[in-house]
């Protein structure tokens, strides 16, 4: 009987402890919930305070106001220092009517006819930042619209702030041999790997690259890891687009002899990481994109430039020849082994550009773009003080231009609707650019209905 009582006592104690633990757990959860609610309320209050503060100062700003009409930076208000000049930068559109507002900044991809700061007052300057593909907003690539802007920062070398080398950190990154593998090892890997690799998941873009590469694959083996023309899998942790700069991804690409570096659009100066990546890894890029690419290559023989007027079969034959001839192949890597950049234009651009890439010691190109506009605003303020006429900046057609998309005429078993769309989209954007320029000339607000009526009566 005594032993049974002890067992009952132990059971009771265990139950009591468990109950106490549950009570304490619920109390902790409740306290955490209260804390989170309080913190959430405080965050909301802080955000509301910022909004109130920003709105409270709408009439108090003593510096030139520059409004990001596209919410690229997300900053409600910031006093930026640009050398000896200061400007107030904000995404708050209520500053449109502020007497100190001097300029509006637009991000090309977000530029929309549905929201424009109109009417455009005499002192209002427009500035365009657009470093991306023309397919993001074809309207901007036509003379009637691009010339509506006063200041530009685009991939074109002719823009006021050229961003042509936006994907290239510096010369040292280009000449480094961190990922360069011996050719003898690459030859050994050819037992299991194709000589050529392709990695793209943005299929059927305006450059029609997938059509060309599909035909090329009929004549030479290509390992395709992306969603486009896929025939080989990446490890699971590398399948997301955010892994394109992962060291493991670099190691896979570095094993190949050739990388197909085909841009999604064919425009002068439109050069992306598709070119720079293989050059940094010590792989020979087979490049199709900017027609003036030789202006930017580190060496005259650092890439194989695709001639779109020649059949892919001819390119395949050339790649096969290089694959079998080490001496000829190594000519394309001689600059890499010597760590020698012979292109004076590229060296000059990287030395003189006023911004850096992934470099905390330099300003980024968005900050430099803002300061370019700020400095020009102040230049005219000083000219006005000296009773001089204002200086006028105006974008030119060359600041953002690209020819119509051109499809390859290879026989296709199937053709996507997206592939067929780009030509029509380009022509439509041309009409839209003309119509919008006409509407802007009236300098009054307009409705979407009025705009489309102008488009279709053009």
UniProtKB/Swiss-Prot annotation:
Source species, domain of life:
Eukaryota
Q: Where is the signal peptide?
A: none
UniProt KW keywords? Disulfide bond, Endoplasmic reticulum, Glycoprotein, Glycosyltransferase, Membrane, Signal-anchor, Transferase, Transmembrane, Transmembrane helix
Classification via InterPro entries: Alpha-1_3-FUT_met (IPR017176), Glyco_tran_10_C (IPR055270), Glyco_tran_10_N (IPR031481), Glyco_trans_10 (IPR001503), GT10-like_C_sf (IPR038577)
SUPFAM superfamilies hit by this protein: UDP-Glycosyltransferase/glycogen phosphorylase
| UniProt-listed GO biological process terms | fucosylation; positive regulation of protein secretion
Q: What EC number is given for this enzyme?
A: 2.4.1.221
Role this protein plays: Protein O-fucosyltransferase that specifically catalyzes O-fucosylation of serine or threonine residues in EMI domains of target proteins. Attaches fucose through an O-glycosidic linkage. O-fucosylation of EMI domain-containing proteins may be required for facilitating protein folding and secretion.
Family of the protein in this entry = Belongs to the glycosyltransferase 10 family.
> Which PANTHER family does the entry link to?
ALPHA- 1,3 -FUCOSYLTRANSFERASE, ALPHA-(1,3)-FUCOSYLTRANSFERASE 10
- Which protein are we looking at? GDP-fucose protein O-fucosyltransferase 3
Q: Which organism is it from?
A: Danio rerio (Zebrafish)
- Show the taxonomic lineage: Eukaryota, Metazoa, Chordata, Craniata, Vertebrata
């Amino acid at each position: 009987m005594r032993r049974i009582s002890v067992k009952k006592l132990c059971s009771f104690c265990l139950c009591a402890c468990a109950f106490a633990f549950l009570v304490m757990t619920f109390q902790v959860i409740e306290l955490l919930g209260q804390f989170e609610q309080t913190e959430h309320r405080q965050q909301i209050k802080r955000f509301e305070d910022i909004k109130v503060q920003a709105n409270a100062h709408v009439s108090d700003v003593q510096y030139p106001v520059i409004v990001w009409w596209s919410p690229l930076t997300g900053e409600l208000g910031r006093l930026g220092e640009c050398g000896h000049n200061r400007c107030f930068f904000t995404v708050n559109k209520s500053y449109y009517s502020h007497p100190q507002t001097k300029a509006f900044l637009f991000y090309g991809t977000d530029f929309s006819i549905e929201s424009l700061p109109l009417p455009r007052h005499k002192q209002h300057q427009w500035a365009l930042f657009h470093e991306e593909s023309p397919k993001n907003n074809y309207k901007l690539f036509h003379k009637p619209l691009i010339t509506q802007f006063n200041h530009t920062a685009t991939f074109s070398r002719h823009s006021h702030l050229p961003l042509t080398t936006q994907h290239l950190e510096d010369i040292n990154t280009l000449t480094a041999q961190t990922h360069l593998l011996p050719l003898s090892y690459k030859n050994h890997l050819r037992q299991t790997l194709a000589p050529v690799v392709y990695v793209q998941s943005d299929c059927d873009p305006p450059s029609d690259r997938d059509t060309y590469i599909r035909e090329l694959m009929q004549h030479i083996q290509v390992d395709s890891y992306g969603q486009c023309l896929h025939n080989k899998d990446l490890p699971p942790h590398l399948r997301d687009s955010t892994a394109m700069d992962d060291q493991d991804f670099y190691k896979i690409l570095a094993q190949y002899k050739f990388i197909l570096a085909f841009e999604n659009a064919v425009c002068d100066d439109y050069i992306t990481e598709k070119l720079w990546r293989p050059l940094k890894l010590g792989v020979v890029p087979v490049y199709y994109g900017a027609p003036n690419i030789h202006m930017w290559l580190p060496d005259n023989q650092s890439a194989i430039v695709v001639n779109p007027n020649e059949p892919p079969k001819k390119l395949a034959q050339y790649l096969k020849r290089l694959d079998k001839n080490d001496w000829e192949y190594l000519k394309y890597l001689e600059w890499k082994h010597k760590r020698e950049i012979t292109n004076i234009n590229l060296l000059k651009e990287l030395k003189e550009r006023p911004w850096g890439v992934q470099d905390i010691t330099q300003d980024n190109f968005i900050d430099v773009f803002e300061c370019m506009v700020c400095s020009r605003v102040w230049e005219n303020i000083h000219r006005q003080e000296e009773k001089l006429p204002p200086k006028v900046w105006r974008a030119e057609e060359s600041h953002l231009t690209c020819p119509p998309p051109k499809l390859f005429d290879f026989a296709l078993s199937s053709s996507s609707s997206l592939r067929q769309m780009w030509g029509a989209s380009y022509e439509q954007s041309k009409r839209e650019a003309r119509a919008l320029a006409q509407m802007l000339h009236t300098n009054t607000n307009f409705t979407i209905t009025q705009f489309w009526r102008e488009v279709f009566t053009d």
